[in-house]
């Protein structure tokens, strides 16, 4: 696994939500799970796809907040943009428990960014995660190997799953799947002003 230069621990602050934005499949969940495997905090990890969690947090009540936070030091919500009213739920958590730590990830920067912009003003730190950079690659791959693979990087990019493939056909398949999922998402949810 290629070590990312982003450091969760340096960006995590009490009384603020650390929001990790980034496109699908850039390694947000992997980054968070790697951090959690090393932390001494008592933590709770949740996924925005959990319908019960979405129902509970979208209520935005003190009771639902207290029940969710419990006696954990760190609360992590992966794919937070899938939870209705997540911005208000996060604000309520931070305001009610300023001594705790919070992390939320979102694969759709526009969705989560627009949802959290106003409610979390002054209550958030943001990390923008991108595909793996040449600098990050240079920590694990020799300079000669980077130069040898430059054409592949230029054609297929450096999404983690693309880098894990060994043949050009496999790389092409992965990048096409990523591209198609973005295009499908765009056409299903394109803005009303876009004809």
Residue spans of the language-model regions?
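Pre-Walker A adenine-sensing motif
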Residues: 1-13
């Amino acid at each position: 696994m290629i070590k990312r230069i982003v450091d969760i621990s340096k960006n995590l602050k009490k009384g603020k939500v650390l929001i990790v934005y980034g496109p699908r499949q850039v390694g947000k969940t992997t980054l968070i799970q790697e951090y959690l495997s090393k932390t001494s905090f008592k933590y709770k990890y949740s996924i925005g796809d959990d319908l019960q969690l979405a129902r509970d947090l979208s209520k935005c009540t003190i009771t639902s907040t207290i029940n969710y936070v419990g006696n954990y030091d760190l609360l992590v919500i992966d794919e937070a943009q899938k939870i209705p009213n997540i911005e208000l739920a996060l604000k309520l958590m931070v305001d009610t428990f300023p001594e705790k730590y919070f992390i939320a990830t979102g694969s759709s920067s526009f969705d989560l960014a627009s949802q959290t912009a106003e409610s979390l003003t002054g209550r958030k730190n943001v990390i923008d995660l991108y595909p793996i950079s040449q600098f990050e690659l240079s920590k694990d791959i020799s300079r000669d190997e980077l130069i040898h693979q430059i054409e592949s990087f230029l054609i297929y990019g450096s999404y983690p799953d693309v880098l894990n493939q060994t043949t050009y056909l496999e790389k092409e398949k992965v990048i096409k799947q990523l591209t198609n999922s973005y295009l499908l998402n765009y056409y299903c949810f394109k803005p009303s002003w876009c004809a």
